[in-house]
Amino acid sequence: MPSFDVVSEANMIEVKNAVEQSNKEISTRFDFKGSDARVEQKERELTLYADDDFKLGQVKDVLIGKLAKRNVDVRFLDYGKIEKIGGDKVKQVATIKKGVSGDLAKKVVRIVKDSKIKVQASIQGDAVRVSGAKRDDLQSVIALLRKEVTDTPLDFNNFRD
């Protein structure tokens, strides 16, 4: 019975590359000369540092541009509050979301069941497994989910026949 998993996970290698490219661009840009603006990555957490709120916005724009160029959806980032740190500097922490949350998993299962397509959807940890008799049904479910779920980036993997 063909099946696939619906997951929501960023490619961490591409995120790391985007962070390195952002730091390289920030170090060479004229408007950041003499400032301590940078992006640091620790596991699934990005920390943006800058001299003031305006420069922090510029750092965020550079990071978003680099992530977009590397095909990493920026909806994976969940920004925290802007914090003041010593010496008139600011920082902001952005966590990278992983997995399909419980609410989103229930929404995906409900969309699949309401579609009347002959497939079954079940929640398995931080993924949703969709299985059906025909591969065409699974492809129509993928198209349906891409159209219906727009607030969170979804990936479809682990295809089995």
Curated annotation (Swiss-Prot):
InterPro entries, alphabetized: DUF520, UPF0234-like_C, UPF0234_N, YajQ-like_sf
Keyword check for Nucleotide-binding: yes
Record key words, sorted: Nucleotide-binding
Domain of life where this protein originates: Bacteria
Family note: Belongs to the YajQ family.
Role according to the record: Nucleotide-binding protein.
Record-given protein name: Nucleotide-binding protein BTH_I0730
Annotated organism of origin: Burkholderia thailandensis (strain ATCC 700388 / DSM 13276 / CCUG 48851 / CIP 106301 / E264)
